[in-house]
Amino acid sequence: MKSDSIKKGPGKAAQRSLLKALGLTNEEISRPIIGIVSSQNEIIPGHMNLDKITEAVRKGVLMSGGTPLVVPTIGVCDGIAMGHEGMKYSLVTRELIADSIECMVKAHAFDALVLIPNCDKIVPGMVMAALRVNVPAVVISGGPMLAGKHKGKDISLTTMFEAVGSYENGTMDEKELCDLEECACPTCGSCSGMFTANSMNCLCEVLGIALPGNGTIPAVFSERIRLAKKAGMAVMDMLKNDIKPRDIINERSIMNALKADMALGCSTNSVLHITAIANEAKVNMNLDIINDLSSKTPDLCKLAPASNIHIENLYAAGGITAIMNELSKKDILDLNCITVTGKTQGENIKGVTVKDYEVIRPIDNPYSENGGIAILRGNLAPDGAVVKRAAVLPKMLVHEGPARVFNSEEEANTAIFDKTINPGDVIVIRYEGPKGGPGMREMLQATAAIAGMGLDDSVALITDGRFSGATRGASIGHVSPEAASGGMIGLLENGDIISIDINNAKLEVKLSDEEIKRRKLNFKPLEPKVKEGYLSRYAKLVSSASEGAILK
């Protein structure tokens, strides 16, 4: 056992004395030591219940003969951080989380890990750490929030952000806004649509690093507690059978995850995170593979924000295993990939069926023959840009209009709320990339305001920043290279004609080669927005969004 390095033999008497200071008996010390990494806190609704998940995992480990020891890690609530300086500190925590777990595992020689995240960056950060330390590991999340109810309709956090736009536009009064506020987020759990947190929790099932049910069992269901106990038991079986994260997450399982991503219509952030996870798994991932997979993978689900269907409905319809089984009917997935159950994906999904074809479309009658995410390229994004095609109105799949250029999210939001954006405009928000932000903020406040003001059928938005999974509309992010690195987005001027063709994966600015060359000669990037602290260090080390915004 790895933990023998801190407990075996006369030379480790001092270390054993410290373990006994924890209250551990000789019997407990002699067993495998299982690190339980919990991101429980009292600021994220999706993490407030993780103490209960942690206790259930502990029981599962104990039932199977291990000694569980709980260690913490940080987490940011993207919704609370949205629309202000705080959003600069969201994506950057992914690397902090991965690094801190690596430190704890290596320093204390844990034999195996159970990782307990729930929301946006915490999930990929923990998966990245699992691959890096490569000891047996299981991910068990806290589960999705139930949808809110208002006047007989299901609502979510997207409803709230868009309601702010409606209020600013004068189409909603303050009483209605406050009524929505009271019921949009009714329970603990990750926000109720196919936003980033739920996207990643669902994709953990497909990667094989989480048990079936991880992505969709609601946070408030007792079944979630039972699943957590099973996770604690499963990691002990993995330790016994020497199954490690790099045995599970490899090129084949990553391709499975990308295909499921297409079928589910996941958040565009999933592209960023899967790319970063692939890097930790030593898998070379080119963004162009996404369009290739999208052309072969139908879109089977339209979940919020693309519709009013939520994760609880996906759970009732059969969950991720049902979607995988549907995809398997056309041999889209590699079902021979091993998982944390010790079985293959094919064995895991055997006998599972779709219970509601209104939620999960049959493979022969999809919403679209193409997947939910597209990579765009062109002179405006030679290294790629990402759009959630499944959440774009059909009339906006092809759009051409004049650029309205802003050097920060705040500038753009002011223009939107001041009602100076016209139908047909293409809002450009730059210097919000991994380096330029720094931290690659999400533009949910801007996109939600556009939708709330009724402009989502005529206005597009492009940025070198990111979008929340709660964003809908012609919102194109991750434009690479970013402005701070001299990318074309930094050369744009008000009035430049932007051409968007999502059907043909194109993103262009209509300028002559001579004009582009002239602008490049005169280009001077803005001064760094942050010159001290963690963000300053991050900006110096972070890679392009096209590489997953990993640190190098």
Swiss-Prot record:
What GO molecular functions are on record for this protein? 2 iron, 2 sulfur cluster binding; dihydroxy-acid dehydratase activity; magnesium ion binding
Q: Which reaction does it catalyse?
A: (2R)-2,3-dihydroxy-3-methylbutanoate = 3-methyl-2-oxobutanoate + H2O; (2R,3R)-2,3-dihydroxy-3-methylpentanoate = (S)-3-methyl-2-oxopentanoate + H2O
Note the Pfam families from the entry.
Answer: ILV_EDD_C (PF24877), ILVD_EDD_N (PF00920)
Q: How is the cofactor bound?
A: Binds 1 [2Fe-2S] cluster per subunit. This cluster acts as a Lewis acid cofactor.
Q: Which residues form the active site?
A: 468
Instruction: Report the pathway entry.
Output: Amino-acid biosynthesis; L-isoleucine biosynthesis; L-isoleucine from 2-oxobutanoate: step 3/4; Amino-acid biosynthesis; L-valine biosynthesis; L-valine from pyruvate: step 3/4
The family line of this record is: Belongs to the IlvD/Edd family.
Sorted alphabetically, which PANTHER family does this protein's record hold?
A: D-XYLONATE DEHYDRATASE (PTHR43661), D-XYLONATE DEHYDRATASE YAGF-RELATED (PTHR43661:SF3)
Provide the protein name.
Dihydroxy-acid dehydratase
Origin species, per record, is Clostridium botulinum (strain Alaska E43 / Type E3)
- Write the gene name: ilvD
